[in-house]
Amino acid sequence: MFNMKILVIPLFWGLVTGYKGNSSDSSAPRLLLVSFDGFRADYLKSYDLPHLQNFIKEGVLVEHVKNVFITKTFPNHYSIVTGLYEESHGIVANSMYDSVTKKHFSESNDKDPFWWNGAEPIWVTNQLQENRSSAAAMWPGTDVPIHNITASYFMNYSSSVSFKERLGNVTTWLSSSNPPVTFAALYWEEPDVSGHKYGPEDKENMRRVLKEVDDLIGDIVLKLKVLGLWDSLNVIITSDHGMAQCSKNRLIDLDSCIDRSNYSVIDLTPVAAILPKINVTEVYDKLKRCNPHMNVYLKEAIPNRFYYQHSSRIQPIILVAEEGWTITLNKSSFKLGDHGYDNSLPSMHPFLAAHGPAFRKGYRQSTINTVDIYPMMCHILGLKPHPNNGTLSHTKCLLVDQWCINLPEAIGIVVSALLVLTMLTGLMIFMRSRASTSRPFSRLQLQEDDDDPLID
């Protein structure tokens, strides 16, 4: 009986401790978040990436991260650090127009806090904690005062700054800042730039580019080891989106369908944001007949699974090209690789790998959502997350302090254990009662001389 209780107690203990947050201690946990833009998930299987594979071998891998729609750079990077869908955090595209304020946003005009204040990214939350600071090298939005706060250490964005300089700054801040940097973010433009230029199916060029990216991952690990940070620092390597192969033979020419005087294009391809200048229905009807390889949605009819309706920055009409197709004006330009398509497409998915004291070793998981990364990071850092669309339980099997089992399964195990305990208890009671049952003649009373032999 006692031994069975010992077996059951850990089950209850695991159920309780598996859902508590990171406990605080004298040494606050630290986290480095790294994004290699446009790193498609299946590059891991298609190319030899020894540094990344060694990183994964000692840590965890999520093979596919389902990102948010639209699968563009600015929106997904903000979803990673807020845990919100695009309609909630407000960065709904790389180019935007707000119908209320009449303001415009673009990759070269992104410094107005108005666009970013719809959410609080993790570097701001971390920055607000006592005796902590944040740092960032080129991560989208980190050079903007969001809610009047920037990270203690950041770099104004410039694509001309080398990875070596970015990494050098981040690791210096991590190793010698006061108050200590407990959260840092690092961004690099490749393999996205080359994916657009060559297309993901150009094996020769993409092999070369991905080798360069893999070497950069090796540089990260080596730098952290040299500085004595490797064993104590949690490191997440991920991306914002994947890449689809495009072709000059798969073009959707809007000029062949509707006159440009009827509308303005806010963002073009592969998800075009259309602001009608005439009757919305008239523009919609013309675009609906334009090309069978393009879905046309009124804002209120955008599929719910995209979570892409409830924002004044989403235009009245949205065009979504099929995978590999390009929306153009007068067939003016196209790229051999592109992204932004339906986020259910595997070609749009990035991956996630992580290493450090917060993560298991040698564990692989098939999928999580981009919005799940934020609550996981908050848990690691001991931060209270803001309301978000992510789910911590989706990532718990990646973490050493989480019980890797679903709550219904845990309840089932405990109930099963109790049933076994009940059965064993009943069996023991039955056996004991049977052992004490009266034997034959046990009721006969022996006299003092009854033990004398019957025969002399």
UniProtKB/Swiss-Prot annotation:
Keywords: Blood coagulation, Cell membrane, Disulfide bond, Glycoprotein, Hemostasis, Hydrolase, Membrane, Metal-binding, Signal, Transmembrane, Transmembrane helix, Zinc
Topology class, membrane: Single-pass type I membrane protein
UniProt binding sites for substrate: 94, 157, 192
Keyword Chaperone assigned: no
MF (Gene Ontology): bis(5'-adenosyl)-triphosphatase activity; metal ion binding
Co-factor requirement: Zn(2+)
Superkingdom in the source lineage: Eukaryota
Catalysed reaction, written as an equation: P(1),P(3)-bis(5'-adenosyl) triphosphate + H2O = AMP + ADP + 2 H(+)
Chain segments annotated as transmembrane: 411-431
Pfam families: Phosphodiest (PF01663)
GO CC list: plasma membrane
Broad class of the protein's primary localization: membrane
Annotated EC: 3.6.1.29
The name this protein goes by in its record: Bis(5'-adenosyl)-triphosphatase enpp4
Protein source organism: Mus musculus (Mouse)
Gene: Enpp4
